[in-house]
Amino acid sequence: MENKYTHGVLFYHEHSGLKNINQGIGEVTTALSSICKHLSIQLSENEGDIIKYCQEIKAKDYAKDVDILFILGGDGTVNELINGVMTHDLQLPIGILPGGTFNDFTKTLNIAPNHKQASEQMISAQVGTYDVIKINNQYALNFVGLGLIVQNAENVQDGSKDIFGKLSYIGSTVKTLLNPTQFNYQLSIDDKTYSGETTMILSANGPFIGGSRIPLTDLSPQDGELNTFIFNEQSFSILNDIFKKRDSMNWNEITQGIEHIPGKKISLTTDPTMKVDIDGEISLETPIDIEVIPNAIQLLTVNDL
C-alpha cells in the first residue's frame, strides 16, 4: 500500500504498562511501517526525554523529514508527548497506541484498547483536531482534578485499589475511603465566581474518566469549552448511579449534589493547598489557572461506525 507519511517516530517507555514492551513494539511496527516510508523507534529512558526529542524534532536536529508521531503507552506517557508537542509547537499528527492501565482519550478517538489492533486502525485513521487544556505552564488532553481523585491516584501509585478505574463499584468502594479531605475553594470561571467547601473538583475536556463516560451528551473535546464539576459531600452515594447510566441521560435528572459549569478560563485557589491530578499525573498544587486552547492538536481518529 502507498505510504501516507515520510518519517514516523514511535515513542515508548520501557515501563509502559505492557508486560513485554519489546514484543509489543514488534506487534505494532508491522502496521505502522506500512504507512510510513521510514519508521524510527525511540525509547524514552527518563521522564522528560520525550519533551527533549520534540524539541530536537522542531529544530530538525532529530531528522529533517519527521511528519507524524506515534506513542505507545498509558495516559502518563501520552501526557508527556502532548506537553512536548504543545511546548515546542510541533504541528504534527499523533497516533496513540494504548499501552497502559487506562487510555481514556483513546476511547474518545474510537481506538481499540489493544495496542496491536490500534496500530492496524492507524492505517485508515483520519486526522482530527482537538482542544487541549493548559494548566499553568503544563498541558493535558483529558482532565484536571483535585480532592478525592488525587487520593485515588495516590492509592493507585501505592498499589491499592483504583476506585475510579472501577466506577461501577464506586458507590460501595468509596465508603472504604472514609473521610475524604474537605477543602475550601474559590473558583472563577469566565469571570463568574463560586466558593464553598467540597471534596472534589474536576474540569474535563474529554468525555471519559477512569474508563467510564461522563453522562453528558454535549461534552466534547472539540467544542472550545471545558466542563467543571463541583462535588458536594453528599454526592458519593449517587456517583455509582451516575456512572452506570447511559450517556443519553439528562444531567439535571440525576443529581443536585454535583454542580456543572461550562467555561473557557478557570482560576482556582483552595485552603488548604491541594495537590492537582492532570491526566493521572500529580505534578502541581493549587492555586492553578486553567484554560482551553481550541483546535490545538492533531490526533489520528478512527471513524465511528
Swiss-Prot record:
UniProt keyword Magnesium, yes or no: yes
Q: Which UniProt keywords apply?
A: ATP-binding, Kinase, Lipid biosynthesis, Lipid metabolism, Magnesium, Metal-binding, Nucleotide-binding, Phospholipid biosynthesis, Phospholipid metabolism, Transferase
Q: Give me the residues that bind Mg(2+), please.
A: S220, D223, E225
Q: Name one GO cellular component term.
A: plasma membrane
Which GO biological-process labels does this protein carry? phospholipid biosynthetic process
One MF term in the entry's GO annotations: ATP-dependent diacylglycerol kinase activity
Q: Looking at the keywords, is Lipid biosynthesis present? A: yes
Please list the residues that make up the active site: E281 (proton acceptor)
Top-level EC class: transferase
Write down the superkingdom of origin.
Bacteria
Residues in DAGKc domain copies: 3-139
The free-text cofactor remark is: Binds 1 Mg(2+) ion per subunit. This ion appears to have a structural role and is required for catalytic activity.
**What does this gene product do?**
May catalyze the ATP-dependent phosphorylation of lipids other than diacylglycerol (DAG). In fact, is not able to exhibit diacylglycerol kinase activity in vitro.
Family of the protein in this entry: Belongs to the diacylglycerol/lipid kinase family.
Name of the protein in question: Putative lipid kinase SAR0780
